[in-house]
Amino acid sequence: PYPRNNFNTELIQLCMNGEHFSLLIEISPIRSKKNIMALKEYLVDGYSKQESCERNNVSISYFCLCLKKLNYTHSIVSALKYFYRE
């Protein structure tokens, strides 16, 4: 069996680079360019949630929803990596 606790992983601000972020966005359900930019500024560039939302004209509530979706995508990828070990 695979470790189910991977579903509780959470993205941490400044702990990913642009390529990692882009790959997660590619397989996530998030499509809004403004939200993607706000998420990138928050997770990769280190802006606060408030700053990222203001700079990209995104509501904080929708930003948080998108962050939750991206966290879910990240947790699924974390669980899947178990099946791709050599």
Regions found by a protein language model. Name each.
Residues 1-11:
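General nucleic-acid-binding
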Residues 51-59:
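Short alpha-helical "recognition helix" segments of helix-turn-helix
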Residues 73-86:
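Short Lys/Arg-enriched helix C-cap and helix-to-coil transition segments
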